[in-house]
């Protein structure tokens, strides 16, 4: 094999909106409320190996806005990307898939959620940046804690993508 074939390779094949739903269970009455809504945001990352060097990474976001105890809206969205990743050592692969890929996808998710919220007739909500490295490290610590409690060795098995 030539040196070119053994070079680390990272390529975004596709970025796409995999799923989105918006619910407004209390419309139109909720538009008459004067109080500011409370907003709750949840974000999750999942990754699947589709082929030897091809991964699908999905960043999911859920935004729930409530006025008092009434739901103004609930939006759930999944922004996905297909990444071609080759010649990367296993110990670097999980962080690449768990940190770099979600960091690439999140601005798309944030934009799609903000657009859906304003199109639904609500004031814009701009999601803050997310430190995916901290999220990854937190998830890794949880896995190590679970593995320790189960009597297994610490860390994710080699080649396992953290979900």
Curated annotation (Swiss-Prot):
Record's subcellular location: Cytoplasm
Domain of life: Bacteria
Keywords attached to this entry: Chaperone, Cytoplasm, Protein transport, Translocation, Transport
InterPro entries: SecB (IPR003708), SecB-like_sf (IPR035958)
UniProt KW Transport keyword: yes
One GO CC term, this protein: cytoplasm
Gene Ontology MF terms in the entry: unfolded protein binding
Pfam families: SecB
Keyword match Lipoprotein: no
GO biological process: protein folding; protein tetramerization; protein transport
UniProt family annotation: Belongs to the SecB family.
Subunit structure: Homotetramer, a dimer of dimers. One homotetramer interacts with 1 SecA dimer.
Function summary: One of the proteins required for the normal export of preproteins out of the cell cytoplasm. It is a molecular chaperone that binds to a subset of precursor proteins, maintaining them in a translocation-competent state. It also specifically binds to its receptor SecA.
NCBIfam families in alphabetical order: PRK05751.1-3 (NF004392), PRK05751.1-5 (NF004394), secB (TIGR00809)
Protein name listed in UniProt: Protein-export protein SecB
Native species: Burkholderia cenocepacia (strain ATCC BAA-245 / DSM 16553 / LMG 16656 / NCTC 13227 / J2315 / CF5610) (Burkholderia cepacia (strain J2315))
Gene: secB
